[in-house]
Design a protein with these regions (language model features):
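Residues on the lipid-exposed face of transmembrane beta-strands in outer-membrane beta-barrel proteins
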Residues: 30-34, 52-56, 96-100, 124-128, ...
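Predominantly the C-terminal beta-signal and adjacent terminal strand-loop region
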Residues: 78, 91, 168-234
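Gram-negative (and chloroplast) outer-membrane scaffold detector with strong preference
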Residues: 62-141
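Residues that define the transmembrane beta-barrel architecture of outer-membrane proteins
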Residues: 24, 44-50, 90-94, 118, ...
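Structural signature of outer-membrane beta-barrel domains
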Residues: 35-37, 71-75, 103, 127-133, ...
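Short glycine/proline- and aromatic-enriched beta-strand/turn motifs that initiate or cap beta-hairpins
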Residues: 19-57, 220
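Short loop/turn motifs that connect adjacent beta-strands in outer-membrane beta-barrel proteins
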Residues: 20-25, 61, 105-118, 169-178, ...
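Extracellular loop and loop/strand-boundary signature of outer-membrane beta-barrel proteins
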Residues: 36-40, 77-88, 144-152, 201-207
Length: 234
């Protein structure tokens, strides 16, 4: 009887060990991509921006991190805009982001498709965007002398909403060491500084917050102390 119990205990320990994986608790990453403005101007133009990020992983699928962006947000066209407005915003943004991946919510270990998409995630955060107009049409070019109200430099609170997917690659020791990340971020600003215009809503009807989106591709490096996941990461 004793050998049977010993064998059963050994089997349970083996199964439990197989269902666990080690993971690094910190990542740094960098990447680049395209911004698009959705402000008060008719033309939602594209710009280019880069980013850097640091994340702390509570589990392989739940994280909290810091992100910094720098680049351009563009919009309008002095020739085609109904009010001849245009701006180029050389911006910087900093935010705290929390993310949760699909792998935290599903059992992906017996389904190859679920395993492939376990890195799908959503997230949200809070931060600040620092606006600096590299170019803005401040005086309406129709001879009227009308000056568009607004600031060339300003800071606005920011609410980033993220959706994306991360693919991690194991090193020879079975740890997720490197990764590639595809992210689509919608940034809702709480202010009127993103496009440099703060006109009367009676003259320029909007009612919507200034928004910019950011699609990026980046690389990640995992490092730091090691945690234990109750799910296998393979």
């Amino acid at each position: 009887m004793k050998p049977i119990l010993t064998s059963l205990m050994a089997l349970l320990l083996c199964l439990n060990a197989n269902a666990q994986s080690n993971f690094y608790k910190m990542t740094i990453g960098a990447g680049a991509g395209a911004t698009q403005s959705f402000a008060d101007l008719a033309k939602h133009d594209y710009g280019f921006a880069g980013y850097g990020a640091f994340d702390y992983l509570f589990t392989p699928f739940v994280s909290l991190g810091l992100e910094g962006q720098m680049g351009e947000i563009n919009g309008g066209d002095v020739n085609t805009d109904p009010n001849n407005r245009q701006f180029i915003n050389s911006y910087k943004a900093f935010a705290i982001n929390g993310k949760i991946s699909l792998g935290a919510l599903i059992n992906y270990q017996r389904n190859s498709f679920a395993n492939a998409i376990k890195g799908l995630y959503v997230g949200a955060g809070a931060g600040v965007v620092m606006n600096k107009m590299r170019f803005v049409v401040r005086e309406k070019p129709d001879g009227s002398g009308y000056i568009f109200p607004g600031k060339d430099s300003s800071n606005d609170l920011l609410i980033p909403l993220n959706v994306g997917i991360a693919f991690n690659f194991m090193d020879r020791y079975g740890y997720s060491k490197y990764g590639i990340n595809f992210n689509y971020q919608t940034n809702i600003t709480l202010g009127e500084g993103l496009d440099g215009y703060d006109d009367s809503p009676l003259k320029f009807k909007s009612g919507n917050p200034d928004i910019y989106t950011y699609f990026s591709i980046g690389l990640k490096y995992h490092f730091g102390s090691v945690g234990l996941s109750t799910k296998t990461l393979y």
